[in-house]
Amino acid sequence: MGCGMSTEDKEGKARNEEIENQLKRDKMMQRNEIKMLLLGAGESGKSTILKQMKLIHEGGYSRDERESFKEIIYSNTVQSMRVILEAMESLELPLEDARNEYHVQTIFMQPAQIEGDSLPPEVGNAIGALWRDTGVQECFKRSREYQLNDSAKYYFDAIDRIAQPDYLPTDQDVLRSRVKTTGITETTFIIGDLTYRMFDVGGQRSERKKWIHCFENVTTILFLVAISEYDQLLFEDETVNRMQEALTLFDSICNSRWFVKTSIILFLNKIDRFKEKLPVSPMKNYFPDYEGGADYAAACDYILNRFVSLNQAEQKQIYTHFTCATDTTQIRFVMAAVNDIIIQENLRLCGLI
């Protein structure tokens, strides 16, 4: 009886080699694929970051894609003015010019979703006239007392351009457009040798139970906080401070058993609005232990420490950036730094460093 391998042994060895080769291929693919979860409370800027990725890494928006944003922008603009006018009633703030009452009725006659290739001229005129009214301006200054889109002032200031018959949204117009994210959306794009799969989930409370489906094999979490909302209340529950809600959510994510080994990149976002608000809306009114007054650097340090100190795991890395998600130049720079971090984390997770 010979000592050579039997046919069965040879087949077994070939199968083992095939499995090992497949595992190596899978590991190489895993090394080149980044699965990133975008988390954060509602309106923190997650969808804006995804739009920036398209601008920075996919050549931006085509003419047809820009055209498709027109109705969203028209609706955002009209609805924002409607919200202010309704707030004027509840706050008992009058129009400075009674003749603008005609324009108020024009706004209230508009449907929730504005359809068509152009904004009706009477609507553009109404928004322009109302935005110049000091009563509307006074109500806008008190917007922390009601729920108003961040993009309102931007679109109102640009209403003459937006109301043009040949209007085509700019990059900035698109970035500032707002559609509530429901469910889970996946965006894939390539940076160098890496394929990013970014998952955006609805930030409102009712959406959070759906996040669990995204949790497996996540390379990293990108968690966004709108730090400008330190003086605002939740859309879903007007007894809860938005910053407190963000802290609670970050605590649950950072210390979750699902993410024991997952690094977190924390974007403290909307720094432009934050800087504007500090002098007129004291942070100490909402966070009594804050002692930095209107000093921007002190306020940033305070918020940063409030979030980072929630991390209970010594081995978990939290990388922080102060961001303005609508600033493409800044986001390009920040995401380049994030890319370097992710490459290192991915190599570590794959056991290659």
Curated annotation (Swiss-Prot):
Keywords: GTP-binding, Metal-binding, Nucleotide-binding, Transducer. A divalent metal cation binds at S47, T181. GO terms for cellular component: cytoplasm; heterotrimeric G-protein complex. Residues 32-353 form the G-alpha domain. The gene is gpaA. Belongs to the G-alpha family. G(q) subfamily. Residues 173-181 are annotated as: G2 motif. Residues 265-272 are annotated as: G4 motif. It comes from Aspergillus fumigatus (strain CBS 144.89 / FGSC A1163 / CEA10). This is G-protein complex alpha subunit gpaA. Residues 7-25 have a biased composition (Basic and acidic residues). GO terms for molecular function: G protein-coupled receptor binding; G-protein beta/gamma-subunit complex binding; GTP binding; GTPase activity; metal ion binding. G-protein complex alpha subunit that plays a role in conidiation and regulation of the biosynthesis of secondary metabolites such as dihydroxynaphthalene (DHN)-melanin, via interaction with the G protein-coupled receptor gprM. Residues 1-25 are annotated as: Disordered. The keyword GTP-binding applies. Residues 35-48 are annotated as: G1 motif. Residues 196-205 are annotated as: G3 motif. Residues 323-328 are annotated as: G5 motif. Disruption phenotype: Leads to a strong increase of dihydroxynaphthalene (DHN)-melanin production. G proteins are composed of 3 units; alpha, beta and gamma. The alpha chain contains the guanine nucleotide binding site. Interacts with gprM. PROSITE patterns: G_ALPHA. The lineage of its organism: Eukaryota, Fungi, Dikarya, Ascomycota, Pezizomycotina. GO terms for biological process: G protein-coupled receptor signaling pathway; pheromone-dependent signal transduction involved in conjugation with cellular fusion. It comes from the Eukaryota.
